[in-house]
Every structure is written in C-alpha cells, then in structure tokens.
Amino acid sequence: GLMSVLKKAGKHVAKNVAVSLMDSLKCKISGGC
C-alpha cells in the first residue's frame, strides 16, 4: 500500500542524507573541503 511506499522512500532519503553527512564529515576531518 501507500504506507509501505512512503516508508521505503523515507528509508532511501534517510540513507542518502546519512551518506552525504558522512562525506562532509570525512571532508572536514581530512581538511580537504
């Protein structure tokens, strides 16, 4: 149903946000921004 679609989309978005946050953290830590 719609709820499962929304949950899947939410997980996908959350994963992308987490990945980009990790990338920016690594960038700041390594000083390569």
Swiss-Prot record:
Expressed by the skin glands. InterPro entries: Antimicrobial_frog_2. Disulfide bonds join C27-C33. GO terms for cellular component: extracellular region. One of its GO terms (biological process) is defense response to bacterium. Pfam families: Antimicrobial_2. The keyword Lyase does not apply. It is found in: Secreted. Keywords: Amphibian defense peptide, Antibiotic, Antimicrobial, Disulfide bond, Secreted. Its main location: secreted. Has antibacterial activity. Belongs to the frog skin active peptide (FSAP) family. Brevinin subfamily. This is Brevinin 2AV. The lineage of its organism: Eukaryota, Metazoa, Chordata, Craniata, Vertebrata.
